[in-house]
Amino acid sequence: MSFDGDELAGMVDPFGALSRAELSEAAREVAFRRGDDLDDAALAAAVDGAVAAYRLVVCPPEAVRFDGDGTDLLAVGPTAFPEPPEGAEDLPHILGVDRRSVDRERLGRAVVERLRGQAARAVDRGEHEQVRQLLDVSYDVEAWAPVDVSDVRERFDSALEE
């Protein structure tokens, strides 16, 4: 059994943010409820893919209220359309994880910094397809968080005009 980025986001959304271990536990629970097996390597790859596609984003510590052990938490990202998979409806009760408050503005600033870094690398390498994809992400980021990404878009536009 595997999950797409929107299903992973659908498992994270009710909690505000989850650690990778908590998300893995949630996915195992959903797989169990569906009578399916879960491949840990495939799940890790799906989570990595969701992060790469901005469906999930890593929360900087200042963006989430969490008395944890410093473990990175994942939150729903700007390109996600959270869709809990069948069998996920009871996860909040099963996992016993309280909802975490995520500061969207702080999280948005961290996402913008990541986007800027990826933009610089894509432009420097002349990766026009990557630039186009990141341009689309930039619009999603502004709709998702109270941040301004116009400077990044200007760089994308300039690179695509060359």
Q: What is the role of each PLM region?
A:
Residues F3, L18-A21, A31-R33, D37-V102:
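Charged low-complexity interaction tracts in eukaryotic proteins
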Residues S24:
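The alpha-helix within a helix-turn-helix
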Residues M11, A46, A50, R155, ...:
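Residues that form generic nucleotide/phosphate-binding pockets
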Residues R106, A110-E162:
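Glycine-rich, aromatic-bearing surface loops/beta-hairpins
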Residues M1-L18, A45, V111-A120:
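Positively charged, polyanion-binding regions of nucleic-acid-associated proteins
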Residues F15-L18, Y54-V58, A122, V141-A145:
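Short secondary-structure junctions and interdomain/linker hinges
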